[in-house]
Swiss-Prot record:
Entry EC number(s): 6.3.5.-
Summary of subunit composition and partner proteins: Heterotrimer of A, B and C subunits.
Organism of this sequence: Streptococcus sanguinis (strain SK36)
Primary enzyme class: ligase
An example Gene Ontology biological process: glutaminyl-tRNAGln biosynthesis via transamidation
Reactions listed under catalytic activity: L-glutamyl-tRNA(Gln) + L-glutamine + ATP + H2O = L-glutaminyl-tRNA(Gln) + L-glutamate + ADP + phosphate + H(+); L-aspartyl-tRNA(Asn) + L-glutamine + ATP + H2O = L-asparaginyl-tRNA(Asn) + L-glutamate + ADP + phosphate + 2 H(+)
Protein name in the entry: Aspartyl/glutamyl-tRNA(Asn/Gln) amidotransferase subunit B
NCBIfam families attached to this UniProt entry: gatB (TIGR00133), PRK05477.1-1 (NF004011), PRK05477.1-2 (NF004012), PRK05477.1-4 (NF004014)
Function: Allows the formation of correctly charged Asn-tRNA(Asn) or Gln-tRNA(Gln) through the transamidation of misacylated Asp-tRNA(Asn) or Glu-tRNA(Gln) in organisms which lack either or both of asparaginyl-tRNA or glutaminyl-tRNA synthetases. The reaction takes place in the presence of glutamine and ATP through an activated phospho-Asp-tRNA(Asn) or phospho-Glu-tRNA(Gln).
Residue stretches in coiled coil: none
GO terms assigned for molecular function: asparaginyl-tRNA synthase (glutamine-hydrolyzing) activity; ATP binding; glutaminyl-tRNA synthase (glutamine-hydrolyzing) activity
Protein backbone atom coordinates (compact mmCIF):
# COMPACT_ATOMS: atom_id res chain seq x y z
CA UNK A 1 0.00 0.00 0.00
CA UNK A 2 1.27 3.46 -0.90
CA UNK A 3 0.75 6.41 1.41
CA UNK A 4 0.49 10.17 1.04
CA UNK A 5 2.31 12.31 3.59
CA UNK A 6 0.47 15.22 5.19
CA UNK A 7 2.50 17.88 7.03
CA UNK A 8 1.64 21.05 8.92
CA UNK A 9 4.14 23.28 10.72
CA UNK A 10 3.95 25.44 13.83
CA UNK A 11 6.66 28.10 13.84
CA UNK A 12 7.42 30.21 16.90
CA UNK A 13 9.12 33.49 15.99
CA UNK A 14 10.64 35.65 18.71
CA UNK A 15 9.83 39.31 18.09
CA UNK A 16 12.76 41.73 18.15
CA UNK A 17 11.40 44.30 20.60
CA UNK A 18 13.48 46.15 23.17
CA UNK A 19 11.23 45.11 26.05
CA UNK A 20 9.00 42.16 26.81
CA UNK A 21 5.38 41.73 25.82
CA UNK A 22 3.80 42.49 29.22
CA UNK A 23 6.67 43.93 31.28
CA UNK A 24 9.31 46.65 30.82
CA UNK A 25 12.19 44.20 31.33
CA UNK A 26 14.71 44.00 28.44
CA UNK A 27 14.12 41.29 25.84
CA UNK A 28 17.77 40.86 24.81
CA UNK A 29 19.47 37.52 24.14
CA UNK A 30 22.64 36.32 25.84
CA UNK A 31 22.54 38.06 29.23
CA UNK A 32 23.43 36.43 32.55
CA UNK A 33 20.66 34.21 33.99
CA UNK A 34 17.71 36.19 35.36
CA UNK A 35 19.34 39.54 34.54
CA UNK A 36 16.47 40.59 32.26
CA UNK A 37 13.59 40.13 34.69
CA UNK A 38 11.30 42.11 36.95
CA UNK A 39 8.39 41.48 39.31
CA UNK A 40 5.95 40.87 36.44
CA UNK A 41 8.17 38.13 35.02
CA UNK A 42 8.43 36.54 38.46
CA UNK A 43 4.65 36.82 38.90
CA UNK A 44 4.75 38.55 42.28
CA UNK A 45 1.32 38.79 43.95
CA UNK A 46 -0.75 41.73 42.74
CA UNK A 47 1.30 42.61 39.65
CA UNK A 48 -0.55 43.11 36.37
CA UNK A 49 0.57 42.79 32.75
CA UNK A 50 0.93 45.93 30.61
CA UNK A 51 0.65 45.48 26.84
CA UNK A 52 3.65 46.45 24.70
CA UNK A 53 2.11 48.30 21.73
CA UNK A 54 5.14 47.49 19.58
CA UNK A 55 4.26 43.80 19.78
CA UNK A 56 0.86 44.48 18.20
CA UNK A 57 2.60 46.56 15.50
CA UNK A 58 4.83 43.59 14.73
CA UNK A 59 1.87 41.21 14.79
CA UNK A 60 0.04 43.34 12.24
CA UNK A 61 3.17 43.52 10.09
CA UNK A 62 3.57 39.73 10.14
CA UNK A 63 -0.09 39.19 9.30
CA UNK A 64 0.07 41.56 6.33
CA UNK A 65 3.32 40.03 5.06
CA UNK A 66 1.69 36.59 5.16
CA UNK A 67 -1.44 37.73 3.29
CA UNK A 68 -3.63 37.28 6.36
CA UNK A 69 -6.89 38.77 7.53
CA UNK A 70 -6.64 40.64 10.83
CA UNK A 71 -8.92 40.34 13.84
CA UNK A 72 -9.58 44.00 14.51
CA UNK A 73 -11.07 43.23 17.91
CA UNK A 74 -8.37 41.14 19.48
CA UNK A 75 -8.05 39.69 22.95
CA UNK A 76 -5.71 37.41 24.88
CA UNK A 77 -6.39 34.13 26.68
CA UNK A 78 -4.88 32.13 29.51
CA UNK A 79 -3.35 28.78 28.64
CA UNK A 80 -3.12 26.94 31.94
CA UNK A 81 -0.28 24.55 32.72
CA UNK A 82 2.29 24.10 35.48
CA UNK A 83 6.02 24.00 34.83
CA UNK A 84 8.95 25.50 36.79
CA UNK A 85 9.82 27.94 33.98
CA UNK A 86 6.26 29.33 34.06
CA UNK A 87 5.83 31.13 37.43
CA UNK A 88 2.18 32.13 36.87
CA UNK A 89 1.16 28.52 36.09
CA UNK A 90 -0.42 29.89 32.93
CA UNK A 91 0.76 31.45 29.68
CA UNK A 92 -0.87 34.53 28.17
CA UNK A 93 -1.61 33.61 24.57
CA UNK A 94 -4.40 33.89 21.98
CA UNK A 95 -6.83 31.03 21.41
CA UNK A 96 -10.01 31.68 19.44
CA UNK A 97 -9.23 35.14 18.03
CA UNK A 98 -5.60 35.32 16.89
CA UNK A 99 -4.28 38.57 15.45
CA UNK A 100 -3.99 37.02 11.97
CA UNK A 101 -5.88 34.27 10.17
CA UNK A 102 -6.58 32.84 6.72
CA UNK A 103 -3.21 33.61 5.11
CA UNK A 104 -0.86 32.02 2.59
CA UNK A 105 2.62 32.10 1.07
CA UNK A 106 4.05 30.60 -2.10
CA UNK A 107 6.91 28.13 -2.10
CA UNK A 108 9.11 27.08 -4.99
CA UNK A 109 9.30 23.33 -5.63
CA UNK A 110 12.30 21.38 -6.88
CA UNK A 111 10.95 21.31 -10.45
CA UNK A 112 10.72 25.11 -10.54
CA UNK A 113 6.94 25.29 -10.12
CA UNK A 114 5.26 27.08 -7.23
CA UNK A 115 2.71 25.95 -4.67
CA UNK A 116 0.51 27.96 -2.33
CA UNK A 117 0.68 26.91 1.33
CA UNK A 118 -2.22 28.17 3.43
CA UNK A 119 -1.63 29.60 6.89
CA UNK A 120 -4.40 28.97 9.40
CA UNK A 121 -3.45 31.54 12.03
CA UNK A 122 -0.77 33.68 13.62
CA UNK A 123 -1.19 34.45 17.30
CA UNK A 124 0.76 36.51 19.82
CA UNK A 125 1.93 35.09 23.12
CA UNK A 126 4.63 35.28 25.76
CA UNK A 127 7.57 32.90 25.84
CA UNK A 128 8.38 30.74 28.86
CA UNK A 129 11.64 30.70 30.79
CA UNK A 130 14.32 28.06 30.43
CA UNK A 131 15.17 25.13 32.69
CA UNK A 132 18.75 23.88 32.92
CA UNK A 133 19.49 20.55 34.56
CA UNK A 134 22.94 20.65 36.15
CA UNK A 135 25.38 17.81 36.70
CA UNK A 136 25.19 18.57 40.44
CA UNK A 137 21.68 17.13 40.58
CA UNK A 138 19.94 20.51 40.74
CA UNK A 139 17.71 22.12 38.14
CA UNK A 140 18.04 25.84 37.50
CA UNK A 141 15.44 28.26 36.17
CA UNK A 142 16.40 31.25 34.00
CA UNK A 143 13.51 33.66 33.44
CA UNK A 144 15.29 35.96 30.98
CA UNK A 145 13.17 34.47 28.20
CA UNK A 146 9.96 34.58 30.27
CA UNK A 147 7.69 37.19 28.71
CA UNK A 148 9.71 37.67 25.52
CA UNK A 149 7.11 38.27 22.78
CA UNK A 150 6.40 35.51 20.27
CA UNK A 151 4.22 35.12 17.25
CA UNK A 152 3.25 31.53 16.48
CA UNK A 153 2.52 30.91 12.81
CA UNK A 154 0.45 27.79 12.18
CA UNK A 155 0.19 26.45 8.65
CA UNK A 156 -2.58 24.32 7.25
CA UNK A 157 -1.63 20.70 6.57
CA UNK A 158 -0.85 21.51 2.93
CA UNK A 159 2.68 20.10 2.62
CA UNK A 160 3.09 16.66 1.11
CA UNK A 161 6.79 15.93 1.61
CA UNK A 162 9.72 16.86 3.86
CA UNK A 163 11.14 18.83 0.91
CA UNK A 164 7.99 20.97 0.74
CA UNK A 165 8.27 21.61 4.48
CA UNK A 166 11.88 22.72 3.99
CA UNK A 167 10.85 25.05 1.14
CA UNK A 168 8.03 26.51 3.27
CA UNK A 169 10.37 27.26 6.17
CA UNK A 170 12.91 28.86 3.84
CA UNK A 171 10.26 31.12 2.29
CA UNK A 172 8.71 31.96 5.67
CA UNK A 173 12.07 32.85 7.20
CA UNK A 174 12.88 35.15 4.28
CA UNK A 175 9.57 36.98 4.57
CA UNK A 176 9.77 37.41 8.36
CA UNK A 177 13.38 38.55 8.14
CA UNK A 178 12.46 41.14 5.51
CA UNK A 179 9.78 42.63 7.78
CA UNK A 180 12.42 43.33 10.44
CA UNK A 181 10.27 41.95 13.26
CA UNK A 182 12.73 39.16 14.10
CA UNK A 183 16.28 38.08 13.32
CA UNK A 184 14.95 34.47 12.96
CA UNK A 185 18.14 32.87 14.30
CA UNK A 186 17.43 29.23 15.10
CA UNK A 187 20.75 28.93 16.94
CA UNK A 188 19.55 31.58 19.43
CA UNK A 189 16.02 30.22 19.67
CA UNK A 190 14.37 33.16 17.93
CA UNK A 191 12.82 30.76 15.40
CA UNK A 192 11.59 27.37 16.61
CA UNK A 193 9.71 24.74 14.66
CA UNK A 194 7.28 21.99 15.66
CA UNK A 195 6.07 19.68 12.90
CA UNK A 196 2.84 17.69 12.67
CA UNK A 197 2.90 14.73 10.32
CA UNK A 198 0.48 11.97 9.37
CA UNK A 199 0.13 9.60 6.45
CA UNK A 200 -2.92 8.22 4.66
CA UNK A 201 -3.56 5.89 1.72
CA UNK A 202 -3.52 7.72 -1.59
CA UNK A 203 -7.03 8.82 -2.50
CA UNK A 204 -8.27 8.96 1.08
CA UNK A 205 -9.60 12.39 2.10
CA UNK A 206 -9.63 11.84 5.86
CA UNK A 207 -6.39 12.68 7.65
CA UNK A 208 -4.48 9.97 9.47
CA UNK A 209 -3.47 10.16 13.14
CA UNK A 210 -0.79 12.81 13.49
CA UNK A 211 2.45 12.87 15.41
CA UNK A 212 4.08 16.08 16.62
CA UNK A 213 7.87 16.39 16.28
CA UNK A 214 10.01 18.58 18.55
CA UNK A 215 13.73 19.29 19.04
CA UNK A 216 14.06 20.36 15.41
CA UNK A 217 17.00 22.75 15.67
CA UNK A 218 17.59 23.41 11.98
CA UNK A 219 15.66 23.25 8.73
CA UNK A 220 17.76 20.26 7.77
CA UNK A 221 16.76 18.44 10.96
CA UNK A 222 13.11 19.24 10.18
CA UNK A 223 13.53 17.57 6.82
CA UNK A 224 15.37 14.56 8.27
CA UNK A 225 12.95 14.13 11.17
CA UNK A 226 9.93 14.20 8.87
CA UNK A 227 11.56 11.74 6.48
CA UNK A 228 12.20 9.30 9.32
CA UNK A 229 8.70 9.73 10.74
CA UNK A 230 6.88 9.13 7.44
CA UNK A 231 8.89 5.93 7.03
CA UNK A 232 8.19 4.85 10.65
CA UNK A 233 4.45 5.42 10.31
CA UNK A 234 4.27 3.59 6.98
CA UNK A 235 6.01 0.55 8.48
CA UNK A 236 3.53 0.48 11.40
CA UNK A 237 0.48 0.63 9.13
CA UNK A 238 1.84 -1.95 6.69
CA UNK A 239 2.38 -4.35 9.60
CA UNK A 240 -1.24 -3.93 10.75
CA UNK A 241 -0.55 -1.55 13.64
CA UNK A 242 -2.09 1.81 14.53
CA UNK A 243 -0.50 5.23 14.86
CA UNK A 244 -0.85 6.87 18.28
CA UNK A 245 -1.28 10.63 18.63
CA UNK A 246 1.89 11.50 20.47
CA UNK A 247 4.75 13.97 20.76
CA UNK A 248 8.17 12.74 19.68
CA UNK A 249 11.58 14.36 19.64
CA UNK A 250 14.18 14.16 16.91
CA UNK A 251 17.51 12.64 17.97
CA UNK A 252 20.28 14.35 16.02
CA UNK A 253 22.80 11.61 16.79
CA UNK A 254 20.72 8.68 15.50
CA UNK A 255 18.47 10.47 13.02
CA UNK A 256 15.44 8.85 14.69
CA UNK A 257 12.37 10.18 16.48
CA UNK A 258 11.80 9.10 20.10
CA UNK A 259 8.62 9.15 22.20
CA UNK A 260 8.28 12.07 24.63
CA UNK A 261 4.64 11.88 25.71
CA UNK A 262 1.12 11.09 24.56
CA UNK A 263 -0.19 14.22 22.85
CA UNK A 264 -2.49 16.53 24.80
CA UNK A 265 -5.48 18.30 23.30
CA UNK A 266 -6.32 21.99 23.67
CA UNK A 267 -8.95 21.19 26.33
CA UNK A 268 -6.17 20.06 28.67
CA UNK A 269 -5.00 23.67 28.89
CA UNK A 270 -8.39 25.01 30.06
CA UNK A 271 -8.24 28.17 27.96
CA UNK A 272 -10.30 31.15 29.08
CA UNK A 273 -10.15 34.91 28.30
CA UNK A 274 -7.34 36.80 30.06
CA UNK A 275 -9.13 38.97 32.68
CA UNK A 276 -6.19 41.34 33.28
CA UNK A 277 -5.98 42.61 29.68
CA UNK A 278 -8.67 44.48 27.72
CA UNK A 279 -9.96 43.79 24.23
CA UNK A 280 -7.72 45.64 21.77
CA UNK A 281 -9.32 47.36 18.80
CA UNK A 282 -7.09 47.58 15.74
CA UNK A 283 -8.42 50.39 13.58
CA UNK A 284 -8.10 50.56 9.79
CA UNK A 285 -5.74 53.55 10.04
CA UNK A 286 -3.40 51.54 12.26
CA UNK A 287 -3.31 48.68 9.76
CA UNK A 288 -2.65 51.02 6.83
CA UNK A 289 0.12 52.77 8.73
CA UNK A 290 1.86 49.44 9.26
CA UNK A 291 1.20 48.38 5.66
CA UNK A 292 2.98 51.50 4.39
CA UNK A 293 6.13 50.44 6.26
CA UNK A 294 6.40 47.04 4.57
CA UNK A 295 9.41 46.58 2.27
CA UNK A 296 9.50 44.97 -1.16
CA UNK A 297 9.71 41.23 -0.49
CA UNK A 298 12.07 38.67 -2.09
CA UNK A 299 9.70 37.53 -4.85
CA UNK A 300 9.17 41.08 -6.09
CA UNK A 301 12.87 41.92 -5.89
CA UNK A 302 13.91 38.78 -7.76
CA UNK A 303 11.56 39.60 -10.61
CA UNK A 304 13.09 43.09 -10.83
CA UNK A 305 16.67 41.81 -10.73
CA UNK A 306 16.02 39.38 -13.56
CA UNK A 307 13.72 41.57 -15.65
CA UNK A 308 15.30 45.00 -15.16
CA UNK A 309 18.95 44.20 -14.47
CA UNK A 310 19.42 41.09 -16.60
CA UNK A 311 20.66 38.88 -13.77
CA UNK A 312 20.14 35.12 -13.73
CA UNK A 313 17.53 33.48 -11.52
CA UNK A 314 20.38 32.03 -9.45
CA UNK A 315 22.01 35.44 -8.90
CA UNK A 316 18.65 36.99 -8.00
CA UNK A 317 17.99 34.29 -5.38
CA UNK A 318 21.44 34.67 -3.85
CA UNK A 319 21.15 38.45 -3.63
CA UNK A 320 17.71 38.33 -1.99
CA UNK A 321 18.46 35.57 0.51
CA UNK A 322 18.80 38.28 3.17
CA UNK A 323 17.35 41.77 3.20
CA UNK A 324 20.67 43.30 4.26
CA UNK A 325 22.47 42.02 1.15
CA UNK A 326 19.56 42.93 -1.11
CA UNK A 327 19.42 46.46 0.32
CA UNK A 328 23.20 46.77 -0.10
CA UNK A 329 22.95 45.67 -3.73
CA UNK A 330 20.21 48.19 -4.49
CA UNK A 331 22.11 51.00 -2.76
CA UNK A 332 25.22 50.16 -4.81
CA UNK A 333 23.19 50.39 -8.02
CA UNK A 334 21.71 53.69 -6.87
CA UNK A 335 25.29 54.94 -6.48
CA UNK A 336 25.97 54.10 -10.13
CA UNK A 337 27.24 50.55 -9.85
CA UNK A 338 26.96 47.99 -12.65
CA UNK A 339 24.45 45.31 -11.64
CA UNK A 340 26.46 42.30 -12.82
CA UNK A 341 29.75 43.57 -11.39
CA UNK A 342 28.19 44.38 -8.00
CA UNK A 343 26.43 41.01 -7.99
CA UNK A 344 29.69 39.18 -8.71
CA UNK A 345 31.51 40.95 -5.89
CA UNK A 346 28.72 40.36 -3.37
CA UNK A 347 28.53 36.66 -4.18
CA UNK A 348 32.30 36.25 -4.48
CA UNK A 349 34.84 38.15 -2.40
CA UNK A 350 32.32 39.78 -0.08
CA UNK A 351 30.52 36.52 0.75
CA UNK A 352 33.83 34.71 1.32
CA UNK A 353 35.03 37.44 3.65
CA UNK A 354 31.79 37.45 5.64
CA UNK A 355 31.87 33.67 6.03
CA UNK A 356 35.50 33.72 7.15
CA UNK A 357 34.88 36.52 9.67
CA UNK A 358 31.51 35.19 10.85
CA UNK A 359 29.87 38.56 10.20
CA UNK A 360 26.93 39.96 8.27
CA UNK A 361 27.28 42.67 5.65
CA UNK A 362 25.86 45.17 8.15
CA UNK A 363 28.71 44.43 10.57
CA UNK A 364 31.62 45.45 8.32
CA UNK A 365 32.78 48.94 7.34
CA UNK A 366 32.27 48.54 3.59
CA UNK A 367 29.51 50.77 2.18
CA UNK A 368 27.64 50.38 -1.12
CA UNK A 369 29.18 53.64 -2.32
CA UNK A 370 32.72 52.48 -1.52
CA UNK A 371 32.22 49.17 -3.32
CA UNK A 372 30.83 50.97 -6.37
CA UNK A 373 33.81 53.34 -6.37
CA UNK A 374 36.23 50.41 -6.20
CA UNK A 375 34.52 48.58 -9.07
CA UNK A 376 34.79 51.76 -11.16
CA UNK A 377 38.55 51.84 -10.48
CA UNK A 378 38.79 48.32 -11.90
CA UNK A 379 36.72 49.25 -14.95
CA UNK A 380 38.84 52.28 -15.85
CA UNK A 381 42.12 50.43 -15.37
CA UNK A 382 43.24 52.31 -12.27
CA UNK A 383 43.64 49.03 -10.35
CA UNK A 384 43.69 45.37 -11.35
CA UNK A 385 41.25 42.76 -10.12
CA UNK A 386 44.05 41.28 -8.02
CA UNK A 387 44.82 44.59 -6.33
CA UNK A 388 41.09 45.17 -5.87
CA UNK A 389 40.92 42.18 -3.53
CA UNK A 390 43.47 43.86 -1.27
CA UNK A 391 41.56 47.14 -1.49
CA UNK A 392 38.31 45.40 -0.58
CA UNK A 393 39.76 43.85 2.58
CA UNK A 394 40.97 47.28 3.67
CA UNK A 395 37.55 48.82 3.02
CA UNK A 396 35.79 45.98 4.86
CA UNK A 397 37.95 46.56 7.92
CA UNK A 398 38.40 50.33 7.86
CA UNK A 399 35.86 51.87 5.49
CA UNK A 400 36.74 55.08 3.68
CA UNK A 401 37.19 56.01 0.04
CA UNK A 402 38.56 53.35 -2.30
CA UNK A 403 40.16 56.00 -4.52
CA UNK A 404 41.90 57.74 -1.62
CA UNK A 405 43.22 54.46 -0.24
CA UNK A 406 44.56 53.35 -3.63
CA UNK A 407 46.41 56.65 -4.06
CA UNK A 408 47.75 56.70 -0.50
CA UNK A 409 48.92 53.07 -0.60
CA UNK A 410 50.51 53.45 -4.04
CA UNK A 411 48.35 50.75 -5.60
CA UNK A 412 47.53 52.51 -8.87
CA UNK A 413 48.02 50.14 -11.79
CA UNK A 414 50.99 50.84 -14.09
CA UNK A 415 49.70 51.07 -17.65
CA UNK A 416 52.19 53.53 -19.16
CA UNK A 417 54.59 51.73 -21.57
CA UNK A 418 57.27 54.28 -20.72
CA UNK A 419 57.21 53.02 -17.12
CA UNK A 420 56.92 49.34 -17.95
CA UNK A 421 59.59 48.99 -20.67
CA UNK A 422 62.61 49.70 -18.40
CA UNK A 423 61.28 47.16 -15.89
CA UNK A 424 60.83 44.58 -18.68
CA UNK A 425 64.45 45.08 -19.76
CA UNK A 426 65.58 44.64 -16.16
CA UNK A 427 63.57 41.40 -15.92
CA UNK A 428 65.22 40.15 -19.13
CA UNK A 429 68.67 40.96 -17.76
CA UNK A 430 68.01 39.08 -14.52
CA UNK A 431 66.50 35.99 -16.17
CA UNK A 432 68.97 34.88 -18.82
CA UNK A 433 67.95 31.23 -18.59
CA UNK A 434 64.31 32.01 -19.34
CA UNK A 435 65.41 34.22 -22.26
CA UNK A 436 67.59 31.46 -23.67
CA UNK A 437 64.78 28.91 -23.22
CA UNK A 438 62.46 31.20 -25.14
CA UNK A 439 64.98 31.66 -27.93
CA UNK A 440 65.34 27.87 -28.04
CA UNK A 441 61.65 27.48 -28.82
CA UNK A 442 60.19 27.09 -25.32
CA UNK A 443 57.36 29.60 -25.53
CA UNK A 444 56.26 28.73 -21.97
CA UNK A 445 59.27 30.64 -20.73
CA UNK A 446 57.28 33.80 -21.39
CA UNK A 447 54.97 32.84 -18.51
CA UNK A 448 57.91 32.86 -16.13
CA UNK A 449 58.97 36.25 -17.39
CA UNK A 450 55.52 37.81 -16.99
CA UNK A 451 55.46 36.39 -13.46
CA UNK A 452 58.78 38.08 -12.71
CA UNK A 453 57.47 41.33 -14.17
CA UNK A 454 54.40 41.25 -11.91
CA UNK A 455 56.65 40.48 -8.95
CA UNK A 456 58.94 43.39 -9.80
CA UNK A 457 55.98 45.78 -9.94
CA UNK A 458 54.38 44.28 -6.80
CA UNK A 459 51.39 43.26 -8.87
CA UNK A 460 50.73 46.79 -10.08
CA UNK A 461 51.52 46.25 -13.76
CA UNK A 462 48.42 46.27 -15.95
CA UNK A 463 48.30 42.57 -16.96
CA UNK A 464 47.02 43.18 -20.49
CA UNK A 465 49.46 46.02 -21.25
CA UNK A 466 52.35 44.18 -19.61
CA UNK A 467 51.69 40.99 -21.59
CA UNK A 468 51.51 42.90 -24.88
CA UNK A 469 54.73 44.84 -24.26
CA UNK A 470 56.62 41.77 -23.05
CA UNK A 471 55.61 39.77 -26.14
CA UNK A 472 56.70 42.63 -28.39
CA UNK A 473 60.09 42.83 -26.68
CA UNK A 474 60.56 39.07 -26.90
CA UNK A 475 59.93 39.16 -30.64
CA UNK A 476 62.77 41.64 -31.00
CA UNK A 477 65.30 39.22 -29.48
Amino acid sequence: MNFETVIGLEVHVELKTNSKIFSPAPAHFGEDPNANTNIIDWSFPGVLPVMNKGVIDYGIKAALALNMDIHQKMHFDRKNYFYPDNPKAYQISQFDEPIGYNGWIEIELEDGTTKKIRIERAHLEEDAGKNTHGSDGYSYVDLNRQGVPLIEIVSEADMRSPEEAYAYLTALKEIIQYTGISDVKMEEGSMRVDANISIRPYGQEEFGTKTELKNLNSFNFVRKGLAFEEKRQAEILRSGGQIRQETRRYDEATGETLLMRVKEGSADYRYFPEPDLPIFEIEDAWIEQVRSSLPAFPKERRAKYVGDYGLSDYDAKQLTATKAVSDFFEAALAAGGDAKAVSNWLQGEVAQYLNAEGKTISEIELTPENLTEMIALIADGTISSKIAKKVFVHLAKNGGSAKEYVQKAGLIQISDPAQLLPIIQEVFANNEKAINDYKGGNKNAAKSLIGQLMKATKGQANPQVAQKLLNEELEKL
